[in-house]
Amino acid sequence: MKAILAILLSLLSLLSYGQRQQVSLLFVGDLMQHQAQIDAALQADSSYDYDHCFALVKDDIQRADLAIGNFETTLGGKPYKGYPQFSSPDEYLHAIKEAGFDILSTANNHSLDRRRKGLERTLTLIDSAGLTAVGTYRDALDRQERYPLLVEKNGVRIAFLCATYGTNGIGITAPNIVNSLDREELAADIRVARAMKPDALIALLHWGNEYQREPSEEQLDLAQWLIGQGVDHIIGSHPHVIQPIARIPHTEYPTQHAVVYSLGNYISNMSIAHGDVGLVVELVLEKVGTTTRLKSLDSHHVWTERATLSRTGKFRLIPADTIPIDLTSYGHFRMKQALELERQ
């Protein structure tokens, strides 16, 4: 009887070891709020409505197990302002939540646009909305309790790091913290993250040079260094244009490290070449036993229909493979032109 029980336990162990678990992660670029976007969302009753922005993309967002975006503004309260120091209506966050996002990276060069009040109010509202912020913190205790961010989904444990190159020269007011790309700090955070025993470690980095379509030497060097330190995948933002994706072979396992140097803008009022097209990237991670691999990496483009191109006077994200019936002929021309330029 004991022998039979031992065999059964052994079989159960093997079945458990061979069980496949998957998680899909969707990443988008800069969720921006220029003045034209704020003005277009204003309603007759002085409230703001952003639902139109995500109407055509929310199904894709909600299909992912986790959806992550770079929240490149603040919720610092009135007066609402766009560039150069952003503060957006609270309704913008509500629309992001309703669209299906789960995690917002908040460490970027606009984190301190409304100083301490803006940083802390942004975190409070993100928490209240049931979303998760990563990259900025009220104080050291807040950071210690929340960072590195560890999320478990479908039996897969994922740790997230998040840091920025700077904050546009605005000094951090103590005790607030904005994670930086300092290598000593990054190395320490990687050690803490690895001690959590995640199945994958992903770094969300605000880095690179604005409007440059190729990664800088600094980005290339930092990516290699981070992978050497134990980071599995890197997702980049800041340049406001799309940069290449690299697949770097793992040195020990039959898998790859994904390095997305820049996703570009997701939604903004930028009309510069390459500034109105963003990249949406989906990583599928598969865990078998104690090994997790990158099962697939897919990407597609989205185009921002600005208010001046729209029949409704509103902003809207349009997937590259979608031609809405209410898209104006000129809007269709501009969308086609932008996508063709991006694919060159």
What are these regions (language model features)?
Residues 19-344:
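Acidic, metal/ion-coordinating pockets
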Residues 5, 9-17:
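Hydrophobic h-region of N-terminal signal peptides that target proteins for export
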